[in-house]
Amino acid sequence: MMNHKKGISVKINTKELVLKISLPALAVVIWELLAIYINNPVILPRVEAVINVLIHPFQGILGTGSLIDNTIISIKRVISGFLLASAVAIPLGILMGYYRTVNSLCDTLIELLRPIPPLAWVPLSLAWFGLGEMSMIFIIFIGAFFPILINTISGVKGVPTPLIEAALTLGAKGRDILIKVVIPASSPSILTGLRVGAGIAWMCVVAAEMLPSSNAGLGYLIMYAYSLSRMDVVIACMIIIGLIGLVLDRGLRYIEDKYFVWRKMMK
């Protein structure tokens, strides 16, 4: 009986794996066929040319350092902006979600600033911080801040009332309810905000690195390679960006599935 169940599980996993890789594989085949048909690497390079860039990550490329060097620089910028956004957005979101007065005070300003795209802040960022790291980190901060904040507020406001009433019945007071009931119960929503914020932060760093203030990073390398008509390098950088974004998302989803399984059971 156990062997039969294992066999079914292996079949399901194999089918799921095939489904997951079939579309990317088809995209690669179409890409290669189009590249052969166009026969112009400036418009669309062959798959082999891009792979050749990817399999030499430690080699210097176009005089801008290696792929690894530029990737690490971009990751450091994302971490800085993302951690700063989390450090501000999570406490503020908890306060706005739990205290009506704080929400009334901050809500109008937040809703006014939230629709503004991160790249619209670029002129102000350059004016405030100059041509340096802080201008790029600020753009990343703006991109990650609002998804984390909104999900935190939503999570705190969405804590079931019976849960709070039960804590009150057991003698818990305002601060204890916030720390021991509200924050743990809203953690899944906060994590969702972190997942969305991380994705946007990663997109923002690439855009920020295309600005005049940058001389390294994947975004800078994309623009520099484009100026030299090296589309193989451009696509290689795009693939790295996509892979890192995928790893970030899957990592946070794994944490959500592993430690917040009770949330799915409640639904």
Swiss-Prot record:
Alphabetical GO biological process terms: transmembrane transport
Residues annotated as transmembrane: 18-38, 48-68, 78-98, 115-135, 136-156, 188-208, 228-248
Start and end residues of each ABC transmembrane type-1 domain: 71-252
Domain of life the protein comes from: Archaea
A Pfam family annotated for this UniProt entry: BPD_transp_1
Homology family: Belongs to the binding-protein-dependent transport system permease family. CysTW subfamily.
Name of the protein this chain belongs to: Putative ABC transporter permease protein MJ0413
Organism per entry: Methanocaldococcus jannaschii (strain ATCC 43067 / DSM 2661 / JAL-1 / JCM 10045 / NBRC 100440)
